[in-house]
């Protein structure tokens, strides 16, 4: 066990520093913005140092473990730890949150509250990735919802209250399934009630009961991921939220659902996952085609990007259903890859809106001439979204293809059919991505309009864009950096819990 509480500090620091915002002198928003940005940078550097010097890549076991008794008779403890599956999302959380804080500098209304909520959300998002106790996982899962709801309801478009209410109804309803599943696992343990991940992973349940738990957890995580038909909150939320909030939603929040499917459904309920995996493959293929077909019909720019996120999450679901090392590693790479790409696209959509004050694509056109930097970065990241070779999206989807084709669970014809449908989805992706670029940047609609001069991307915005673009290219060229984190844990997970 690690004797220095690295993970506790990493979780507690942002929200504690957020409370100190209330005591900062009232000297305008500049002090608050710089304070929040410095806290995020310190947190990211602290996380990188702790993982860089104290995390062993070749060890599939839980590392940086902490265990402090809390409520003894319930076996509820402050139990933290990370492994190869959770380290990537935690680093992604720190990176995207830091850039989202920098992106939020134009926010001036209630700046003190806004930045406090950003830091509280930071703690709430790291919590589930590092929890090793089921009840602590649930508490962190719920803690993160409160700042998200307030960020959605207080800053955004005209229908922000509607989208925030829809978000909280969906997520709070799904949390009931999560809590019931956790209590069920705790009380159904064969020896004594337990809430620890490690102990629960070694428990065996009757098949019918395990399937019931699996369905409950799946519903809870399907809302967050999101998985159709529980996805309808996402386009509305993205369409109305401020773009810095959208960066956190697309880059981190959706990945929490996928992480939950791996950490609980796959690791704790292996037999049920093996039974339901063919259905995951079916749902994933339907989701890819459905979202890719629906996206071109969206007039709202951010809603179109939101549906592209739904389509990309379909690839992750298929990777989880493949039940082999290649497929699961590809799914984890897709989680990281889309975290960067989704956050970047929403940031660029928001910076475009700051200039032209238009949300509908059919009202845009001709922006490439007036804002060439935004046009260039938007084009490159759209290419990354449609899996251009050399970008992280291409590597992730290619490995997912290999994962399906090498899976031992499915017949050859089934694998060919799934691969064919996925290929159709990959063909549809350039249709909505390239048409989005055409409607926004090509033509002369805005260029010939009166007052058509727009200021191009400034140093701050260009820095945020490039900071996200560089990891996308780096992972596309050298994906082994991500695989070196997860490959040993994935191998241990599948060898221990799945039987052909």
Swiss-Prot record:
BP-aspect Gene Ontology terms: ATP synthesis coupled electron transport; electron transport coupled proton transport
Listed transmembrane segments: 4-24, 37-57, 84-104, 111-129, 134-154, 167-187, 208-228, 242-262, 272-292, 305-325, 330-350, 386-406, 416-436, 462-482
Gene Ontology CC: one annotated term: chloroplast thylakoid membrane
Catalytic reaction annotation: a plastoquinone + NADH + (n+1) H(+)(in) = a plastoquinol + NAD(+) + n H(+)(out); a plastoquinone + NADPH + (n+1) H(+)(in) = a plastoquinol + NADP(+) + n H(+)(out)
Assigned keywords, A-Z: Chloroplast, Membrane, NAD, NADP, Plastid, Plastoquinone, Quinone, Thylakoid, Translocase, Transmembrane, Transmembrane helix
Root EC class: translocase
Location relative to the cell: Plastid, Chloroplast thylakoid membrane
Thylakoid found in the keyword field: yes
Molecular functions (GO terms): NADH dehydrogenase (ubiquinone) activity; ubiquinone binding
Entry-linked InterPro entries: NADH_Q_OxRdtase_chain4 (IPR022997), NADH_Q_OxRdtase_chainM/4 (IPR010227), NADH_UbQ_OxRdtase (IPR003918), ND/Mrp_TM (IPR001750)
EC number, as in UniProt: 7.1.1.-
Membrane topology qualifier: Multi-pass membrane protein
Main location class: plastid
Family: Belongs to the complex I subunit 4 family.
HAMAP family: NDH1_NuoM
PANTHER family per record: NAD(P)H-QUINONE OXIDOREDUCTASE CHAIN 4, CHLOROPLASTIC, NADH-UBIQUINONE OXIDOREDUCTASE CHAIN 4
Name of the protein described by the UniProt record: NAD(P)H-quinone oxidoreductase chain 4, chloroplastic
Organism per entry: Morus indica
Gene: ndhD
């Amino acid at each position: 066990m690690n004797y220095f509480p690295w993970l506790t500090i990493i979780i507690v620091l942002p929200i504690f520093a957020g409370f100190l915002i209330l005591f900062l002198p009232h000297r305008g928003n500049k002090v608050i913005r710089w304070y929040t940005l410095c806290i995020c940078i310190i947190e990211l550097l602290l996380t990188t140092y702790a993982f860089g010097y104290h995390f062993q890549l070749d060890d599939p076991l839980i590392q940086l473990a902490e265990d402090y008794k809390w409520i003894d008779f319930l076996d509820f403890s402050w139990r933290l730890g990370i492994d190869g599956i959770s380290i990537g999302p935690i680093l992604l959380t720190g990176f995207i949150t830091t850039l989202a804080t920098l992106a939020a500098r134009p926010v001036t209304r209630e700046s003190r509250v806004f930045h406090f909520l950003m830091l509280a959300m930071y703690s709430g998002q790291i919590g589930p990735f590092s929890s090793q106790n089921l009840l602590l996982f649930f508490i962190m899962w719920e803690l993160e919802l409160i700042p998200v709801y307030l960020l959605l309801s207080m800053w955004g478009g005209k229908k922000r209250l509607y989208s925030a209410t829809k978000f909280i109804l969906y997520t709070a309803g799904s949390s009931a399934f999560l809590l019931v599943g956790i209590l069920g696992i705790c009380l159904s343990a064969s020896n004594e009630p337990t809430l620890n991940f490690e102990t629960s992973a070694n428990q065996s349940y009757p098949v019918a009961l395990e399937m019931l738990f699996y369905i409950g957890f799946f519903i809870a995580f399907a809302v967050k991921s999101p998985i159709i038909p529980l996805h309808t909150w996402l386009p509305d939320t993205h369409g109305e939220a401020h773009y810095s909030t959208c960066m956190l939603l697309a880059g981190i929040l959706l990945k929490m659902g996928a992480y939950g499917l791996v950490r609980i459904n796959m690791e704790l309920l292996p037999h049920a996952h093996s039974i339901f995996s063919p259905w995951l493959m079916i749902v994933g293929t339907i989701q890819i085609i459905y979202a890719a077909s629906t996206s071109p019909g969206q007039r709202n720019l951010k809603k179109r990007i939101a549906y592209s996120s739904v389509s990309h999450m379909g690839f992750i679901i298929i990777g989880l259903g493949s039940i082999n090392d290649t497929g699961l590693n590809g799914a984890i790479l897709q989680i990281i890859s889309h975290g960067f790409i989704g956050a970047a696209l929403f940031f660029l959509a928001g910076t475009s809106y700051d200039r032209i004050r238009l949300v509908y694509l059919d009202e845009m056109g001709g922006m490439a001439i007036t804002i060439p930097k935004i046009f260039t970065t938007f084009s490159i990241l759209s290419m990354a979204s449609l899996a251009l070779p050399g970008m992280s999206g291409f590597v992730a989807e290619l490995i997912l293809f290999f994962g399906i084709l090498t899976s031992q669970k499915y017949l050859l014809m089934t694998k060919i059919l799934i691969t064919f449908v996925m290929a159709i989805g990959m063909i549809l992706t350039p249709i909505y991505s390239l048409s989005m670029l055409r409607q926004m940047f090509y033509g002369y609609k805005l260029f010939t309009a009166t007052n058509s001069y727009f200021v191009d991307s400034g140093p701050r915005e260009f820095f945020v864009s490039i900071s996200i673009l560089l990891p996308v290219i780096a992972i596309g060229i050298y994906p082994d950096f991500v695989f070196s984190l997860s490959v040993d844990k994935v191998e241990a997970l599948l060898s221990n819990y799945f039987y052909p």
